[in-house]
């Protein structure tokens, strides 16, 4: 792969980024004859975008179970500051175990990006949808894999260039998957036509916070199983001593925000895990979307001096 200049992926990049909220009442930023009739997004979207003029790859981030997209704003701004447009839909407010509606909504939003997103961004910013990454955290990670696999009746015409699972979870335990089950328990069974995949795991995700609460990323349905079913190229990193929700914002408001500190086994603070996840995502995207693999190789070789956590496990399938 070729090289290009870049900053340390685990710190903020060179681009100033802003947050935008788009919903059915949002007005277009770019007033053109076509924009006047541009459709509103199917779901409320939180967008982190560079403000400098340019074309930028697009990354969709699907939130975890009963979480708000706003809880990921610090992570989104970190990744966006390296030259990416982040899109985080609010897929639901209340949901049962079935994820089919989320799969359907994600495919619909992906289709909307091609016709609607450009009209709602700052005039000087252009989304490059030929470089599109689909990512998700927890239940959102499962949803991202489900959409990419295209075997549940809903898919998008937008090509997925890379796929990222951030501590993905497919249920409460082996044999207790939430419908529709994504994991097949067959090694290398995810046929994604050589789409590059990044799977990030939390070292404490398999550990219950106390006897009253089950683990947030239980064995048998977590990042390990997702990676086992991947075909190459696929990368798997596990952060030691950090938990399933440690990549969220420091200040997550409301009852759901406060409960995010109480339900899972957590690390000492969120910033290191959030920076780790953001840096891995940036390094992976730079490698597979931009052709600059220097930081990803340094992380793989254990010689990146700025990794903010201890890497407990690392695997790669090429």
UniProtKB/Swiss-Prot annotation:
The lineage of its organism: Eukaryota, Viridiplantae, Streptophyta, Embryophyta, Tracheophyta. A motif (GXSXG) lies at residues 136-140. It is found in: Cytoplasm, Cytosol. It is an enzyme of class 3 (hydrolase). GO terms for biological process: chlorophyll catabolic process. It comes from the Eukaryota. This is Chlorophyllase-2. Catalyzes the hydrolysis of ester bond in chlorophyll to yield chlorophyllide and phytol. Does not seem to be required for chlorophyll degradation during senescence. It comes from Arabidopsis thaliana. Pathway: Porphyrin-containing compound metabolism; chlorophyll degradation. Belongs to the AB hydrolase superfamily. Lipase family.
């Amino acid at each position: 792969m070729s090289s290009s200049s870049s900053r340390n992926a685990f710190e903020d990049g060179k681009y100033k980024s802003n947050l935008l909220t788009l919903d059915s009442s949002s007005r277009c930023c770019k007033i053109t004859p076509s924009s006047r009739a541009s459709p509103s997004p199917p779901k409320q979207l939180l967008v982190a975008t560079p403000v400098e003029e340019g074309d930028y790859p697009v990354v969709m981030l699907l939130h975890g179970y009963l979480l708000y997209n706003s809880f990921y704003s610090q992570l989104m701004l970190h990744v966006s500051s390296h030259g990416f447009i982040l899109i985080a839909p609010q897929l639901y407010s209340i949901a049962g175990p079935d994820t089919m509606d989320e799969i359907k909504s994600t495919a619909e939003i992906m289709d909307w990006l091609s016709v609607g997103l450009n009209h709602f961004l700052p005039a000087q910013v252009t989304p490059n949808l030929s470089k599109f990454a689909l990512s998700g955290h927890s239940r959102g990670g499962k949803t991202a894999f489900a959409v990419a696999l295209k075997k549940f009746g809903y898919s998008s015409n937008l090509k997925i260039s890379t796929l990222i699972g951030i501590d993905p979870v497919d249920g409460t335990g082996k044999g207790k998957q939430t419908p529709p089950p994504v994991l097949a328990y067959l090694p290398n069974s995810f046929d994604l036509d050589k789409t590059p995949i990044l799977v990030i795991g939390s070292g404490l995700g398999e550990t219950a916070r106390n006897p009253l609460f089950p683990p947030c990323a239980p064995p048998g349905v977590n990042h390990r199983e997702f990676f086992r079913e991947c075909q190459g190229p696929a990368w798997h990193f596990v952060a030691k001593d950090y938990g399933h929700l440690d990549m969220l914002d420091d200040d997550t408001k409301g009852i759901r925000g406060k409960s995010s500190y109480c339900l899972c086994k957590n690390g000492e603070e969120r910033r290191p895990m959030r920076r780790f996840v953001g840096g891995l995502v940036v390094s992976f995207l730079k490698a597979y979307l931009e052709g600059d693999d220097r930081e990803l190789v340094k992380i793989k070789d254990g010689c990146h001096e700025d990794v903010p956590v201890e890497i407990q496990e690392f695997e790669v399938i090429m």
